[in-house]
Amino acid sequence: MEEENATLLTEFVLTGFLYQPQWKIPLFLAFLVIYLITIMGNLGLIAVIWKDPHLHIPMYLLLGNLAFVDAWISSTVTPKMLNNFLAKSKMISLSECKIQFFSFAISVTTECFLLATMAYDRYVAICKPLLYPAIMTNGLCIRLLILSYVGGILHALIHEGFLFRLTFCNSNIVHHIYCDTIPLSKISCTDSSINFLMVFIFSGSIQVFSIVTILVSYTFVLFAILKKKSDKGVRKAFSTCGAHLFSVSLYYGPLLFIYVGPASPQADDQDMVEPLFYTVIIPLLNPIIYSLRNKQVTVSFTKMLKKHVKVSY
């Protein structure tokens, strides 16, 4: 009865890092620089792959889509966070909040599937090199990409549907850097236990599936590498695989902790720091880890750069 008589809230305050006003300008400048580098790096990678016909193969199609999704994740979260550093009003409407969460859920879930697909691609390329052209065709790659995006959309729709059942009447303070189902469920005056359960079941299943796929694929890859006789080749392959696994661990570690681990009833500072790994840091690092270490990408980028410099002069 109290819930029915209460005034329903339709606007929220995203606190973000605003509880430390003395850091407002330095944090704004830091995140702005990171965001600009992230967008330029990922869009630059997409342009290189798009322009060079030699890179129109599964490995680079997957890499280009990873760059697109990284730019998407960063653009979903960072602009609003930057605005909140400087704007007098930190409000976000309920509809805008739901749109931001929907975009975030699609992009993050799609990246989970993409990382698993990329690990499988590396497994086939290294463990079955002679069969690679027959197994990992462009047609199969495109189908896997479509499945990744469809999986992301369906997963987002599930949580968006359960988000619509929530009502808010007690507090409009969201202690987070973006609108997410868990912090919103914590301040809802509707019973949100089903929302937490859906997050655990669906988010947990997707993360476990993709992590297992990645670990199994790279385990076979590492065994295949150890059979090689070239010390230089082994060191290079270990370095590349290590960098990839480092990126994956930074991405999945916070995701598992937030969406699969037990949810604390009260918000704390960790709720804002951990999401920075998969919304800000990983989109910045992925172009470096997956591209600058790749000879074909760097050669194509150099050629494109030289061509544009000649045209400008």
Swiss-Prot record:
Task: Please provide, in alphabetical order, the Gene Ontology terms of the cellular component aspect for this entry.
Answer: plasma membrane
Please indicate if the UniProt record lists Chaperone as a keyword: no
Tell me, what does this protein do in biology?
Answer: Odorant receptor.
One Pfam family of this chain: 7tm_4
| Places the protein is found | Cell membrane
Gene from which the chain derives:
OR5H1
Q: Name the domain of life.
A: Eukaryota
**What molecular function terms (GO) are annotated for this protein?**
G protein-coupled receptor activity; odorant binding; olfactory receptor activity
Q: Which SUPFAM superfamilies does the entry mention? A: Family A G protein-coupled receptor-like (SSF81321)
* Topological domain spans for side Extracellular: 1-28, 78-98, 165-195, 262-271
Q: Which residues are glycosylated?
A: 5
Query: What name does the UniProt record give this protein?
Result: Olfactory receptor 5H1
Q: Would the keyword Cell wall biogenesis/degradation be found if you checked this record's keyword annotation?
A: no
Q: Which family, according to the similarity comment?
A: Belongs to the G-protein coupled receptor 1 family.
The membrane topology noted for this protein in its Swiss-Prot or TrEMBL record is: Multi-pass membrane protein
> What organism does the UniProt record list as the source?
Homo sapiens
Which of UniProt's keywords are assigned here? Cell membrane, Disulfide bond, G-protein coupled receptor, Glycoprotein, Membrane, Olfaction, Receptor, Sensory transduction, Transducer, Transmembrane, Transmembrane helix
Cytoplasmic face: residue ranges? Answer: 50-56, 120-143, 217-240, 293-313
Membrane-spanning intervals of the chain: 29-49, 57-77, 99-119, 144-164, 196-216, 241-261, 272-292
Q: Which cysteines are joined by disulfide bonds?
A: 97-179
> Matching InterPro entries, A to Z?
GPCR_Rhodpsn, GPCR_Rhodpsn_7TM, Olfact_rcpt
